[in-house]
């Protein structure tokens, strides 16, 4: 899949789960719609995130606010959230509505938490995991569970689907954060090391802080001096966990 087309990971997981738990592996129209809703919510959150992060590219192409303007980007994200909510209501399943509504709340909460903890070298790993759950894992966990709800699974199986989605989501986020240091712009679909430059301290940085106290000095002054970002990257390269 090319960088500009996106991964389609989230709807793909929903469709695979839905097919696996459906009689004769046949997808229903509601399961297909759930996958579409999942991608709408994800895309809407990316449009808004790019505005907040002032990102110029996403998946190798201009972001919405770069191509048009901030006002259009905010309204486009709002429209996608609204359309997702409309299709969600038309599934006529209040439990699915609750699950996906929780996701939208988590996405906003995660973005707030991320920005409140910018350049905070004292940030705990548990805060990072909680933020990662809100921004990434919640959507995969709750949409996986929603697929089970539409199939009429019992509570035990629904919990298993939720846990599966949660673990996949957290693992995906950690790998994505590692790639921010080991990948290139083309692979990532966005500028490399953009998270660190923006003050978002991810798993590799938190581990590096345990080994290199000088890194906390650079981060606490918000990488303000000329060579601070390069020095921070050198610290990352010598982190045993990243290697």
Segments (PLM) and residue ranges:
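All-alpha prenyltransferase/terpene-synthase fold signal
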Residues: 1-240
């Amino acid at each position: 899949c090319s960088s500009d087309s996106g991964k389609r990971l989230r709807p793909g997981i929903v469709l695979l789960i839905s097919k696996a738990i459906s009689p004769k592996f046949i997808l229903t129209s509601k399961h297909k719609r759930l996958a579409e809703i999942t991608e709408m919510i994800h895309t809407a959150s990316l449009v808004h995130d790019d505005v907040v992060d002032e990102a110029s590219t996403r998946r190798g192409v201009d972001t919405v606010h770069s191509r048009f303007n901030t006002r259009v980007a905010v309204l486009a994200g709002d429209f996608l959230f609204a359309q997702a909510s409309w299709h969600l209501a038309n599934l006529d399943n209040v439990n699915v509505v609750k699950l996906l509504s929780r996701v939208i709340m988590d996405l906003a909460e995660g973005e707030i938490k991320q920005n409140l903890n910018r350049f905070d070298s004292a940030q705990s790993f548990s805060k990072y995991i909680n933020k990662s759950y809100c921004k990434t894992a919640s959507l995969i966990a709750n949409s996986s569970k929603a697929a089970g709800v539409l199939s009429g699974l019992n509570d035990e199986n629904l919990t298993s689907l939720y846990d599966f989605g949660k673990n996949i989501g957290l693992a995906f986020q950690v790998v994505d954060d590692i790639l921010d240091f080991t990948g290139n712009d083309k692979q990532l679909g966005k500028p490399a090391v953009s998270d660190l430059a923006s003050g978002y301290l991810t798993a590799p940085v938190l581990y590096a802080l345990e080994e290199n106290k000088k890194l906390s000095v650079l981060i606490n002054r918000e990488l303000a001096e000329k060579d601070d970002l390069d020095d921070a990257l050198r610290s990352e390269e010598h982190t045993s966990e990243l290697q």
